[in-house]
Curated annotation (Swiss-Prot):
Gene name linked to the record: sthA
Entry's Gene Ontology cellular component terms: cytosol
Cofactor(s) needed for function: FAD
Catalytic activity: NAD(+) + NADPH = NADH + NADP(+)
Matching Pfam families: Pyr_redox_2 (PF07992), Pyr_redox_dim (PF02852)
Originating organism: Pseudomonas putida (strain GB-1)
Coiled-coil annotated spans: none
Known role: Conversion of NADPH, generated by peripheral catabolic pathways, to NADH, which can enter the respiratory chain for energy generation.
E.C. code: 1.6.1.1
Annotated positions binding FAD: 35-44
Cofactor, how bound (note): Binds 1 FAD per subunit.
A GO term, aspect molecular function: NAD(P)+ transhydrogenase (Si-specific) activity
Name by which UniProt lists this protein: Soluble pyridine nucleotide transhydrogenase
C-alpha cells in the first residue's frame, strides 16, 4: 500500500471540489483530488449541468428552425430523435473534461481515480479501479462528493421505461408521451426539453405552485408558458405506485388518478453521495437525505474536515458549489477568500429560462417593506424582437424611499445572463445600490441589458 502526505485532500472533482482544490493549491498547499470516476468533472460535467444544458441548447435550435417562417423557404419543420440531439452534449463533455484536467495539471494537484473512504480523521484510503489501495494522509480533508437522484425503494428503476435525471441520458428512443414526476428545477427543465422535441409531457407536482420559491408572477408566467407548449401540470398530487409495462408505464396517484405514458422520469429530490465514505469511522452523521451538516466556515463536526456543494444541501447549484468549495479551502488556508455563500442568483434553464436574485414580492410584503416594482416586457425590446424571443420580462423590486434594489427577477431570453447586471449593482455598498444607476448609465443598443433602463423608468414613474 502506497502512502502519500498532503496538506489538503479533496473528495470529489465537481464544482465544489474544483473550487476547493484550486484555492488551496494557489495558496501554496500540497493538494490531492480523489474521484470515483475515471475522468474529472463530477456529476455536474458528466450527468447534470453540462449535458442537460447542451441538450437544451440543441433543442432550442430545433425549435427556432421549426417556428421561424424564414426557414420554410428551405424546408418543412423537422423533428430529431432524442439520441441524435444528445450527441451534441457528448462533445461538450469531452471538452470540459480536457479543460479541467488541464487546470489540475497546471496547479500541480495530484488526481487519484478510485473510491475514497475515511480510515480515520486524517487518512483517506483510495481503492483504485485495478484494486490497488493507496493511503492519503492529510491535515485537512474537504468532502465535495455531490449528490445523486433520490430513488424510493418501492420504485423499480431497473425497468426499461423508468428513468431518473442521471439515467435519462441513456434514453435510446423518443417517447411520444412522458411523465415527469417532480416539478422542481430539474423536473421543469426536462419538461421543457422534451416538450421542445414535440413530446407530450405530464408534469406531476406535489405542491400547489410551480417553483414556489420564485416570485409568484414569474412562477405564474412559467405555468402559462407550459400550458401553451404540450405540458400538462398536475398540482397537489403524490404517487402511490409506479406500474411498469412492456409498452409503457402507469403512474398511480393517491388521488385515485392514473396516468399512462411511454416512459417516466423521476425528478423528486436528490441524495448526498456519502454512503461509501466511511463516515462512521470518524463520527460524522448525515440526515435522511445523506447530507452533511456544516457551520458557516463549512466545517463539519470534526474540526479538520469540511464539506461543500450538493453534499451539504441547499442551494444545490453548481455556481454556489464552486464558491462553497473555494470558501471551505479559504477557511483552511486563511487567505481572506472565505465567505459564507448565501445570496446567489438562481438560474433555471427552462425554455424560456428564469433567473433571480434577492427578495421576491411575497417576502417583501410579509416583511412589510415599502417597495415598488419596475418592469420591462421583452415584447417591446428591440433585441428581443430581432432574436424572435418576445416572451418574458425583467422585474426590479426596489425600496420606494431609498431606491435600494431589493430583488431582480427575469423570465425569458438570456435571463441567466441578464440577472448579473442587477446582482453587480445590488452588491455595491450603501447608496451606490440605487435604481437611478440604470437611468444614468449608457447601455449598448440594441441589447437585452437595456431592459434595466426601461424597468427603472417604469418603477420611477410609479412613485408619488
Amino acid at each position: 500500500m502506497a502512502v502519500y502526505n498532503y496538506d489538503v485532500v479533496v473528495l470529489g472533482s465537481g464544482p465544489a471540489g474544483e473550487g476547493a482544490a484550486m484555492n488551496a493549491a494557489k495558496a501554496g498547499r500540497k493538494v490531492a483530488m480523489v474521484d470515483d470516476r475515471r475522468q474529472v468533472g463530477g456529476n455536474c460535467t458528466h450527468l447534470g449541468t453540462i449535458p442537460s444544458k447542451a441538450l437544451r441548447h440543441s433543442v432550442r435550435q430545433i425549435m427556432q428552425f421549426n417556428t421561424n417562417p424564414m426557414f420554410r423557404a428551405i424546408g418543412e419543420p423537422r423533428w430529431f430523435s432524442f439520441p441524435d440531439v444528445l450527441k451534441s452534449a457528448e462533445k461538450v463533455i469531452s471538452k470540459q473534461v480536457a479543460s479541467r484536467t488541464g487546470y489540475y495539471a497546471r496547479n500541480r494537484v495530484d488526481v487519484f481515480f478510485g473510491t475514497g473512504s475515511f480510515a480515520d480523521e486524517q487518512t483517506v484510503e483510495v481503492v483504485c479501479p485495478n484494486g490497488v489501495v493507496e493511503k492519503l494522509n492529510a491535515k485537512h480533508i474537504i468532502i465535495a462528493t455531490g449528490s445523486r437522484p433520490y430513488r424510493p425503494a418501492d420504485i423499480d428503476f431497473h425497468h426499461p421505461r423508468v428513468y431518473d435525471s442521471d439515467t435519462i441520458l441513456s434514453l435510446s428512443h423518443t417517447p411520444r408521451k412522458l411523465i415527469v414526476y417532480g416539478a422542481g428545477v430539474i423536473g421543469c427543465e426536462y419538461a421543457s426539453i422534451f416538450s421542445g422535441l414535440g413530446v407530450l409531457v405530464e408534469l406531476v407536482d406535489n405542491r400547489g405552485q410551480l417553483l414556489s420559491f420564485l416570485d409568484s408572477e414569474i412562477s405564474q408566467a412559467l405555468s402559462y408558458h407550459f400550458s401553451n407548449n404540450n405540458i400538462t401540470v398536475r398540482h397537489n398530487e403524490e404517487y402511490e405506485r409506479v406500474e411498469g409495462l412492456d409498452n409503457g408505464v402507469i403512474l398511480h396517484l393517491k388521488s385515485g388518478k392514473k396516468i399512462k405514458a411511454d416512459a417516466l422520469l423521476w425528478c423528486n429530490g436528490r441524495t448526498g453521495n456519502t454512503d461509501k465514505l466511511g463516515l462512521e469511522n470518524i463520527g460524522i452523521k448525515v440526515n435522511s437525505r445523506g447530507q452533511i451538516e456544516v457551520d458557516e466556515a463549512y466545517r463539519t463536526t470534526v474540526p479538520n474536515i469540511y464539506g461543500a456543494g450538493d453534499v451539504i444541501g441547499w442551494p444545490s447549484l453548481a455556481s454556489a458549489a464552486h464558491d462553497q468549495g473555494r470558501s471551505a479551502a479559504g477557511s483552511i488556508v486563511d487567505n481572506g477568500s472565505w465567505r459564507f455563500v448565501n445570496d446567489v442568483p438562481t438560474g433555471i434553464y427552462t425554455i424560456p429560462e428564469i433567473s433571480s436574485i434577492g427578495k421576491n414580492e411575497q417576502e417583501l410584503t410579509q416583511a412589510k417593506v415599502p417597495y415598488e416594482v419596475g418592469k420591462a416586457f421583452f415584447k417591446g425590446m428591440a433585441r428581443a424582437q430581432i432574436a424572435g424571443e418576445p416572451q418574458g420580462m425583467l422585474k426590479i423590486l426596489f425600496h420606494r424611499e431609498t431606491l435600494e434594489i431589493l430583488g431582480v427577477h427575469c423570465f425569458g431570453y438570456q435571463a441567466s445572463e441578464i440577472v448579473h447586471i442587477g446582482q453587480a449593482i445590488m452588491n455595491q455598498p450603501g447608496e451606490h445600490n440605487n435604481l437611478k444607476y440604470f437611468v444614468n448609465t449608457t447601455f449598448n443598443y440594441p441589447t437585452m441589458a437595456e431592459a434595466y433602463r426601461v424597468a427603472a423608468y417604469d418603477g420611477l414613474n410609479r412613485l408619488f
